[in-house]
Amino acid sequence: MRSPYGVPRNPFDPAYIPGGSSSGSAVAVAAGLASFALGTDTAGSGRVPAAFNNIVGLKPTRGLLSTRGVVPACHSLDCVSIFALSVADAAIVFDCALGFDAEDPYSRRMPAGFGAFGAVPARFSVGVPRPGQREFFGNSEAARLFEAAIARLAALGGDIVEIDFAPFSEAAALVYGGPWLAERRAAIDAAIAGRRELLHPVTRRVVAASDGLPAAEVFRGQELLATLAQETETVWRRIDMLLVPTTGTIYRIAEVEADPLALNATLGHYTNFANLLDLSAIAVPNGVQSNGLPAGVCLIAPAFHDPLLAAVGAAFQRQGGLPLGATGATLPPIEVTPAPVPYPYLPIAVVGAHLEGQKLNGELLALGARLRRAVRTAPDYRLYALADGRRPGLVRDPGAGTAIEAEIWDVPVAAIGAFLASVTPPLGLGTIALEDGSAVSGFLCEAYAVEGAREISEFGGWRAWRSSRQEGR
């Protein structure tokens, strides 16, 4: 918000702040002056302005958009962000801008099959902070709107899981209270040498906080961050994404000018940790308070989960039915083609030893796979007990088969190669038609292997067959 050109005006109430350092870009989009605009997001400047201007703020995985040419704030954490009126527009711009830049030391190559937009899974798990950990800083309307957002995500297919938010908030405190302050200073040291008086007073206070910081503190900070990141890993094993308010509240310009550092920390409560923990995020509009000011929510997930966040974020925005920015326009029926690979997971149907609780299920768990749902195949399959006695064989026989019990597991795309290597003949992966008319990749058996094998289709599945054998002993 600090600028030699003055403070951009919040189009909903000029007495209130429009956001952070990229708020000019956000205001331009909200007012309909531009279809999209770029920002930078180190600690939340690509998301907070989105919330305050009723628009979308896409903060990609670190390194997917080049930061070459960007004046750094904290180079290892900086991201180029995208503001747009809709998630679809933001995803289209993201897709155009994606690419590795050998001249940016923090640029990262995107994984094979990666695209900016994915598909909404039938079911997905959404983490939310425990009720006692939700901070709205006295804003009861923001709290009410967040509860409504939780209900809307549940209606879209989200399974709501309360999580411990403590390691995320502890990591957030490191942005302005840890050794990363020294990196901020390093970014501008040469430019301000002997001329600190040229800095804005607030910026000068932030930079001065790193004066005399011992080198050992940098390593202590890195170790603390690694510890917190490991703690959050236990959370990510339970959920696909995290839902938080983009900010807990909003302030008047006069309030921020009176106490800039403290209120800035408050506004970053739900955003400051994302880049430190290498997470992807998208801020989407959520509702309007009684005073006419918008409030937003943020969907957050591990690195390279951007397509999943865009898909769910687009569905959430459409369900909300809010006008676009401050334009008064409604969301058009834009359809974005999902990437060919359903990043970050590939659904795999299993019918035998990989079922939950069965002998080989541990292989899936070791790869980080998660059970999505129990299903049945279309009534076009036969199931056989193979000669080794450890696995069944599923063979398609259109018009002469039956529906077979199966489970769909979401396997990380990055682990598919290792999973395929573990599958031995006569089994392989093919396409399985399901009872609901959809199709999914899954285990099939070569026809030669079932010659002379016992057919167990009448049992309806591998579990029932094994139970019958144990009961018969």
Model-derived features with residue positions:
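Short helix-loop capping/hinge segments that flank enzyme active sites or metal/cofactor-binding pockets
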Residues: 120-129, 179-233, 238, 283-293
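Short, surface-exposed loop/helix-turn segments at secondary-structure junctions
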Residues: 8, 107, 174-176, 180, ...
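Short glycine/serine-rich loop segments
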Residues: 1-97, 275-298
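Small-aliphatic-rich amphipathic alpha-helix that forms the alpha element of a beta-alpha
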Residues: 231-234, 262-285
